[in-house]
From Swiss-Prot:
GO terms for molecular function: ribonucleoprotein complex binding. It comes from the Eukaryota. SUPFAM superfamilies: WD40 repeat-like (SSF50978). This is Ribosome biogenesis protein YTM1. GO terms for biological process: chromosome organization; maturation of 5.8S rRNA from tricistronic rRNA transcript (SSU-rRNA, 5.8S rRNA, LSU-rRNA); maturation of LSU-rRNA from tricistronic rRNA transcript (SSU-rRNA, 5.8S rRNA, LSU-rRNA); protein-RNA complex remodeling. It holds the Pfam family NLE. Keywords: Nucleus, Repeat, Ribosome biogenesis, rRNA processing, WD repeat. Residues 99-453 are annotated as: Sufficient for interaction with ERB1 and association with 66S pre-ribosomes. CDD domains: WD40. WD repeats lie at residues 101-139, 141-179, 199-237, 278-318, 320-359, 366-406, 417-453. The gene is YTM1. One of its GO terms (cellular component) is preribosome, large subunit precursor.
């Protein structure tokens, strides 16, 4: 019998909650020449759909991107093998929606529950954008490029930058439906700094916020800062006293930075609750554990992933990889940490596994330069997006080793390899996949209906 007419026995099943997508649980035969499209036709026929629904297929957790015959050959299986084939609604290609122009390179992004976008820029300004591309507010105060921004709530945010500080910002008057953060904030105007957080000795490049009013910051001074979103809970810093005590030890540049900050003499200054030390190289990203905010993670140019007990401020686990790590995202349902690296790939790690066990569970390959930003899909536990200095954003399903889709920069003035580096990505359920970088653009690729219903 020719390979074209050969068949394999299989069973289709799905984990989709929609009962209308469930086929009868019974084995059947299918041509081994079928690929994704042909299998999708078979499932639609079994479901009796007049309007076809595109599906993706997995065998033993591996996303099928080849024919059944090629799959059998790849895994050394014969056509006598019985296959359990999982199907799930296919992901549609994210289409370009819009882009907004900024004054300088955009280093960081976040999206609030109000669907407002905040951006941090190399011109030292934090901006709030609506989805029409209008700047609603600008927040000035940092004396150097901003490297990280994060919403605390719809009325509070935090930023960090090359001036070695974090700033707590008031974005608007408190909504009466939300709890009051600080009773004496009423004297602070919208768009003003609530407090300057000092303690790092090098640029602050990463920030994460927990739901229990805590902040983590990663810095190029090799430390992680642990702070409160409520400034009253932190120790007061007296800038004049510090300047006086350290005047003889401070460099000229340090003295200049300190004098610049003294211009904001009326702004509160606070010290960290703790500075966590263990890394031997710059800390590139930090994150609270999705399920337990007393646990934190950090990745560094020193090649390590560290797990922290934030109650005791102790490092409780270190995993050493072969490359500098530049970005971090959690896949909480899968209990995995995704790490972007200087080696151009993304590695998946299980933080529960001891450092003596296998360090890397999987590797995603496709980028051609540093992978500097990651974010997970809000609607699919297996998916994430990545931003790279190669000028692209890639969409991944971690069950496959190669990207599903590649998003390029839409700006006409972008020159490949010159001004196309992507510095930040964010995947929002309501807004879409947002990316920004060296082209001074905030780009949105359509996220609505990315999963066909």
């Amino acid at each position: 019998m020719s390979s074209d007419s050969s068949q394999v026995k299989l069973r289709f099943f799905t984990r989709e909650q929609d009962e209308s997508l469930h086929v009868q649980d019974a084995p059947m035969y299918a041509p081994i020449s079928l690929k994704r499209y042909g299998l999708s036709e078979v499932v639609n026929h079994l479901l009796g759909f007049e309007k076809p629904v595109p599906f993706d297929f997995l065998i033993d957790g591996e996303l099928l991107r080849i024919s059944l015959q090629e799959y059998l050959t790849k895994h050394g299986l014969s056509s006598e093998t019985f296959l359990n084939v999982e199907y799930t609604r296919a992901v549609l290609p994210p289409s370009f929606l819009s882009s907004f122009s900024n004054e300088d390179w955009v280093s960081s992004l976040d999206v609030g529950d109000n669907n407002k976008i905040i951006s941090g820029s190399y011109d030292g300004v934090v901006r709030t954008w609506n989805l029409s591309g209008k700047i609603e507010k600008q927040y000035s105060g940092h004396s150097a490029p901003i490297r990280a921004v994060k919403y605390i709530s719809n009325t509070r945010m935090v930023s960090g930058g090359n001036d070695r500080t974090l700033r707590l910002w008031k974005t608007k008057n408190e909504d009466l439906k939300q709890p009051v953060v600080d009773e004496d904030d009423e004297d602070i105007e919208d768009g003003k700094t609530l407090a300057i957080l000092e303690g790092h000795k090098a640029p602050v490049v990463s920030i994460d916020v927990s739901d229990n009013s805590r902040i983590l910051s990663g810095s190029y001074d090799n430390t992680i800062g642990f702070w409160s979103t409520i400034y009253k809970e932190m120790t007061v810093v007296d800038p004049m006293e510090e300047l006086k005590n350290n005047d003889s030890k401070m460099s000229t540049a340090a003295k200049k930075r300190r004098k610049l900050t003294l211009k904001d003499g009326t702004i509160r200054r606070r010290a960290p609750l703790a500075l966590l030390e263990s890394h031997t190289g710059p800390v590139e990203q930090v994150s609270f554990d999705f399920k337990d905010n007393t646990v934190g993670y950090s990745i560094s140019q020193d090649h390590t992933i560290k797990t922290w007990d934030l109650v005791t401020s102790r490092c409780i686990d270190t995993k050493t990889t072969s490359y500098s790590l530049l970005s971090l995202a959690q896949l909480p349902t899968l209990n995995l940490l995704a790490c972007g690296s200087s080696a151009r790939h993304i590695t998946l790690h299980d933080p529960r596994i001891g450092s003596t066990s296998k360090i890397t569970q999987q590797q995603l390959v496709g980028h051609k330069n540093f992978v500097v930003s990651l974010d997970t899909c809000p609607e699919n536990e297996y998916m994430l997006c990545s931003g790279s200095h190669d000028g692209t954003v890639k969409v991944w399903d971690v069950r496959a080793n190669s990207p599903m889709y590649t998003i390029t920069r839409e700006e006409q003035s972008v020159e490949k390899g010159v001004n196309d580096k992507v510095f930040a990505v964010n995947w929002s359920k309501n807004v879409g996949i947002i990316s920004a970088g060296q082209d001074k653009k905030i780009q949105i690729n359509k996220g609505d209906n990315i999963f066909k219903s």
